[in-house]
Regions:
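Conserved SGNH/GDSL esterase-like catalytic core that processes O-acyl groups on lipids
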Residues: 1-71, 78, 94-96, 166, ...
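Extracytoplasmic/secreted proteins, especially bacterial periplasmic and envelope-associated proteins
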Residues: 2, 33, 60, 64-75, ...
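Sec-exported extracytoplasmic/periplasmic mature domains
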Residues: 8, 39, 51, 74-81, ...
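Active-site proximal loops enriched in glycine and acidic residues that flank catalytic Cys/His/Asp
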Residues: 20-23, 49-52, 87-92, 139-142, ...
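Conserved, well-ordered alpha-helix/loop/beta-strand core segments that scaffold catalytic motifs
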Residues: 47-51, 73, 84-89, 124
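Extended hydrophobic-aromatic, low-complexity segments
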Residues: 57-58, 84-88, 96-99, 148-149
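Catalytic His-Asp segment of secreted/periplasmic serine-dependent ester chemistry enzymes
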Residues: 93-217
Length: 217
């Protein structure tokens, strides 16, 4: 809700809808009746936030990942031809890993948390996909510190849940506020009409008019 309140503070009267499904992968949405729900709303801007669950699968297949995003955006655009897409990258997360440790001469197996090595691949795949198609992307992973420090920054700030995958309310609130501020900033800096931007990755401007409705996955 922090994204909604941040946008409404700048653009009063904007309508915001949220279609999140906890634990869902991107392909869940184009196989689901979610496309019909989005079409019924007919949003001006659709924020697509995937990546954390994809990063917890096996090694990323970049071609399959791009195909999934293509199918999703194509099926939405068939129903909403004027919609603008804004992708976001995942914030970063940890994996549980079994290791052996020797204590008092006895070898024991224990579980430790390690930074998820798949997140950079997923984030880079999303950024590359948007660059190639001139779609907007907000690179939260890089903003948070990237491969070197995104995960530790979130954890050390006390914003992550104990599973080190999900976030506390304060963490999600911060992410929503940052995204809302980025959208407002991109609009304020817009210079040319009718173009989508790679937010935080270049100066290509957004469409120079306020959005009336925003939807988010």
């Amino acid at each position: 809700r922090s994204l909604e309140s941040t946008l409404q503070a700048t653009f009063p009267g904007i309508r915001f809808s949220f279609y999140g499904i906890n634990g869902a992968w991107a392909r869940r949405f184009y196989e689901h009746d979610m496309i019909s729900r989005v079409a019924a709303e007919n949003p001006d801007l659709l924020v697509i936030s995937f990546g954390t669950n994809e990063a917890h699968g096996s090694a990323l297949d970049r071609q399959a990942h791009a195909k999934t995003m293509d199918l999703l955006t194509q099926r939405i655009r068939e129903r909403c031809p004027d919609v603008c897409f804004l992708f976001t990258t995942p914030p970063g997360s940890y994996l549980s890993q079994r290791v052996y440790r020797t204590t008092r001469g006895r070898r024991r197996r224990t579980t430790v948390k390690v930074v998820n090595p798949n997140t950079p691949d997923v984030a880079n795949s999303i950024v590359r996909y948007c660059q190639e198609r001139q779609m907007a992307v907000w690179d939260l992973y890089t903003i948070a510190g990237g491969e070197q420090s995104a995960c530790t920054n979130w954890r050390d700030a006390g914003l992550m849940n104990t599973d080190l995958v999900h976030f506390l309310t304060t963490g999600y609130t911060l992410q929503g506020t940052l995204l809302g501020e980025a959208i407002c900033k991109a609009y304020e800096e817009a210079a040319l009409p009718g173009t989508q931007t790679r937010m935080m990755h270049g100066s290509t401007p957004l469409e120079q008019k306020p959005y009336k409705s925003v939807a988010g996955f």
